[in-house]
Amino acid sequence: MASRVSAPPRGREPQRYYDRRGRDDAETRKRGSRSPQPLSEDEELTDADPPRRPNAGPRRRLFLEETEDRLTSLLESLTKDIESDIEHFERKLRVLLQQKDTI
């Protein structure tokens, strides 16, 4: 007896994928990947764009705020480290230039 190929259940829509701006992303859907594509060079994400999860609960908002605080702290720390390194190399460069002038 021949085996039958099962069809997808009726009434169910295929999975839809959306890009960062909430638009249906046909290219992503074609590949079957759930991850959004990076914005192209002529696109940029702005505050006017709709949020990805407009109904985020209080736990999600708290998580996002804490993450933003940690990232801000890390950025400030890295900025200080870079500024310190720049000052260090400027001092070394001045010393080397002075030594060059004395030779």
From Swiss-Prot:
Which coarse location class applies to the principal site listed for this UniProt protein? Answer: host cell
What post-translational events are described? Answer: Phosphorylated by host ERK. The phosphorylation triggers a structural change that enhances keratin binding and protein stability.
Where along the chain is composition biased (Basic and acidic residues)? 10-30
Spans annotated as Disordered: 1-64
The UniProt record lists the keyword Phosphoprotein: yes
GO cellular component term, pick one: host cell nucleus
Keywords of this entry: Early protein, Host cytoplasm, Host G2/M cell cycle arrest by virus, Host nucleus, Host-virus interaction, Modulation of host cell cycle by virus, Phosphoprotein
Q: Where would you find this protein in the cell?
A: Host cytoplasm; Host nucleus
GO BP annotations of the record are: symbiont-mediated arrest of host cell cycle during G2/M transition
Per the entry, what this protein does is: Contributes to multiple aspects of the viral life cycle including viral genome amplification, suppression of suprabasal cell differentiation and egress of newly formed virions. Induces host cell cycle arrest at the G2 phase by associating with and preventing the nuclear entry of host CDK1/cyclin B1 complexes. Inhibits cellular DNA replication by preventing loading of host replication licensing proteins MCM2 and MCM7 onto chromatin. Within the cytoplasm, associates with host kinase SRPK1, a splicing factor regulator, and inhibits its activity.
Question: Further remark, if any?
Answer: The major E4 form is first synthesized as an E1^E4 fusion protein from spliced E1^E4 transcripts, such that the first few amino acids of the E4 protein are derived from the N terminus of E1.
Q: What quaternary structure, including any partners, is listed in this protein's UniProt entry?
A: Assembles into oligomeric complexes. Interacts with host CDK1. Interacts with host SRPK1; this interaction may favor expression of late viral transcripts. Interacts with host cytokeratin components KRT8 and KRT18.
> What family does the Swiss-Prot or TrEMBL record give for this protein?
Belongs to the papillomaviridae E4 protein family.
Name of the protein: Protein E4
Native organism is Human papillomavirus type 41
